[in-house]
C-alpha cells in the first residue's frame, strides 16, 4: 500500500483538450527543458561546485520534463485520443436519441472543437512563454521576486521570503544563466508567431542587430539584480537606484505585458471551454449512469494498494520489479560516460567480489 499526494489529474478531459495538453503544454515543457537542462548538465559535469549548486534544481526540472515525455508516449501508445473520440461519438448519438437532452447538451462537442482550435496558437505561445521565461533564466526569477516582494508581510513570512531569495542568489552561476537566457530567447522566437513576441525582441533587433548574446551581455552588465545588491538597495531605499529603470525589471514587465495580451486574447474561448468541458463531463455521467466515476486527483492525500510486480512498457520488453548485479553492470557498459549511470569504483569492487 502507498500513501501520498499525487498532484492533479484530468482524466475526463475531452479529446480536444488532450490534444492541446499533448501538443502545447507537454511539448513546450519537453522542448524547452531539454535545452535548459543540457546547458546545466554540461556545466555540472565540468565542475563539482556547479554540480552541487545545480543538482537539486536540475532534478526538479527533470521531474516534470520526464513526466511530460512519458505522458505523451502513453497518450499515443494507449490511443487515448482515439478512445475519447469514440466515446464522444457515442455521446453525440445518445444526445440525438434523447429529445429532452438536446437543448442542454447539443453542440457542446462542436463548440469545444472550435474553441480549442481558436485558442491553440495562444495556448501554445503561453506554454512556451512560461517555460522559456517564467521558468527559464534565474535572473528573471530573481527580478520577479524583488518586484513582487511584500515588505508589509508578517515578520516570519518576511524572513522566509528573504531566505528564499538569498538562497536563489547563492545558487546562480551567472555565466550559465546567460547561456540559458540566450537559448530561451532563441527558442521562443523560433517556435511562436511573430505577433507573440514582446517588445524586447524589437529592441534586440533594432539596438543589437538581432544578436541575442549581445543583448543578454548588456542586460547582465547593467542590472543590479544579478546579485543581492539590488535587493539590498531596495531595502535601504537607496535614492540613487530606481528599481523600475533596472533592465531586468524592464524585461520582466515587458514579458508580463505580453503574457496578459496572450491570455486576454483567449478569454472568450477559455470561458467556452470551461463551460463545455463541465457539460461534457455531466453528459457522459448521465449516459453511463451505471458506471463508477473516480474523482480526479486534487493534491490531497490518496491511498493505493495492490501487488508489487514488473511491467512491460512495449512488445517483447519486460521489466522486473527488482535490480540485479548483472543489470547494474549492463547499464554501466551501455551508458559509459553518462554521469547518471556512474557507479563508485568501491561499489563496483564490492559487486565484483560478491561482497
Q: Where are the model-predicted features located?
A:
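Terminal presequence/propeptide segments associated with secretion/organelle targeting
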Residues: 1-355
Amino acid at each position: 500500500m502507498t500513501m501520498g499526494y499525487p498532484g492533479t489529474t484530468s482524466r475526463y478531459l475531452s479529446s480536444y483538450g488532450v490534444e492541446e495538453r499533448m501538443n502545447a503544454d507537454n511539448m513546450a515543457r519537453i522542448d524547452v527543458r531539454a535545452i535548459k537542462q543540457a546547458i546545466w548538465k554540461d556545466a555540472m559535469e565540468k565542475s563539482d561546485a556547479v554540480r552541487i549548486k545545480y543538482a537539486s534544481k536540475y532534478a526538479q526540472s527533470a521531474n516534470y520534463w520526464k513526466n511530460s515525455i512519458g505522458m505523451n508516449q502513453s497518450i499515443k501508445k494507449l490511443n487515448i485520443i482515439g478512445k475519447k473520440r469514440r466515446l464522444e461519438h457515442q455521446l453525440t448519438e445518445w444526445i440525438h436519441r434523447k429529445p429532452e437532452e438536446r437543448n442542454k447538451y447539443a453542440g457542446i462537442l462542436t463548440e469545444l472543437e472550435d474553441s480549442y482550435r481558436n485558442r491553440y496558437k495562444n495556448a501554445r505561445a503561453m506554454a512556451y512563454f512560461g517555460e522559456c521565461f517564467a521558468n527559464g533564466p534565474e535572473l528573471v526569477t530573481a527580478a520577479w521576486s524583488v518586484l513582487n516582494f511584500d515588505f508589509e508581510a508578517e515578520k516570519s513570512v518576511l524572513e522566509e521570503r528573504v531566505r528564499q531569495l538569498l538562497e536563489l542568489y547563492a545558487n546562480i552561476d551567472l555565466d550559465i544563466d546567460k547561456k540559458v537566457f540566450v537559448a530561451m530567447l532563441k527558442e521562443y522566437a523560433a517556435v511562436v508567431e511573430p505577433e507573440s513576441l514582446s517588445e524586447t525582441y524589437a529592441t534586440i533587433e533594432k539596438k543589437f542587430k538581432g544578436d541575442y548574446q549581445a543583448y543578454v551581455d548588456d542586460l547582465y552588465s547593467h542590472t543590479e539584480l544579478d546579485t543581492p545588491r539590488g535587493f539590498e538597495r531596495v531595502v535601504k531605499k537607496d535614492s540613487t537606484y530606481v528599481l523600475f529603470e533596472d533592465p531586468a525589471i524592464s524585461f520582466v514587465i515587458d514579458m508580463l505585458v505580453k503574457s496578459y495580451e496572450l491570455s486576454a486574447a483567449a478569454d472568450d474561448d477559455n470561458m467556452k471551454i470551461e463551460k463545455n468541458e463541465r457539460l461534457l463531463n455531466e453528459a457522459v455521467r448521465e449516459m453511463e449512469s451505471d458506471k463508477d466515476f473516480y474523482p480526479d486527483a486534487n493534491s490531497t492525500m490518496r491511498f493505493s494498494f495492490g501487488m508489487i510486480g514488473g511491467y512491460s512498457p512495449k512488445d517483447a520488453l519486460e521489466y522486473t520489479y527488482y535490480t540485479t548485479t548483472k543489470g547494474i553492470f549492463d547499464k554501466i557498459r551501455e551508458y559509459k560516460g553518462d554521469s547518471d549511470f556512474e557507479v563508485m569504483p568501491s561499489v563496483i569492487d564490492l559487486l565484483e567480489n560478491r561482497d
